[in-house]
A protein has these predicted regions:
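Residues at helix-coil transition
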Residues: 42, 142-145
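Catalytic core of nucleotidyl cyclases, primarily class III adenylyl/guanylyl cyclases
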Residues: 69, 100-132, 146-179
């Protein structure tokens, strides 16, 4: 009976207000995690609008520079490697690339397989967009020259790069995984 009384007292000490406060705290923490993830996936200005419930309309940027790159011989490397080796290789390489782009006024649009796409001049306009991308390309080439593929240490990694300057229309596409 004494155990039953202690149990009843504990139940009574947890007031509805305590429960509401705990749920509110959990909700705030979850909201914070969601916003942090959104800010990692999208440019800050776009993420801020979305978290404030403001729509993001497509916008024309008159002058931007886009960088594309892929890995020379990637398809044949994949055919001679295990899926885990390929994933580890791309993770190592693109983690290095992601570290490098932090030093430039650029936004990483996406990576698909061995393709890496970066832009300068949007969502924040800058007159130095072409110089930003050209300097980034040189830095990434230098990183590739020093990069060793852990499961193919005798292979030389080569990067194929394309850049283009001109007008761009940018917007948020999709709901499940906005881009």
């Amino acid at each position: 009976n004494r155990d039953r009384m202690v149990e009843m007292r504990e139940k009574c000490s947890n007031t509805p207000e305590d429960s509401v406060m705990e749920r509110t705290r959990q909700l705030c923490e979850e909201k914070q995690r969601t916003e942090e993830l959104l800010h990692r996936m999208l440019p800050k200005t776009v993420a801020r609008k979305l978290t404030q419930g403001i729509g993001v309309e497509p916008e024309t940027f008159e002058q931007c520079t886009i960088y594309f790159s892929d890995i020379v011989g990637f398809t044949s490397m994949c055919s001679e490697s295990t899926p885990l080796q390929v994933v580890n290789f791309l993770n190592e390489l693109y983690s290095k690339f992601d570290e490098i782009i932090q030093g430039f006024d650029v936004y990483k649009v996406e990576t698909i397989g061995d393709a890496y796409m970066v832009v300068s001049g949007l969502p924040e306009r800058t007159p130095a967009h072409a110089g930003n991308i050209a300097s980034l390309a040189i830095e990434l080439l230098a990183a590739v020259n020093n990069f060793r593929i852990s499961h193919r240490p005798n292979d030389t990694l080569q990067l194929r790069i394309g850049m283009h300057t001109g007008p761009v229309v940018a917007g948020v596409v999709g709901l499940a995984m906005p881009r």
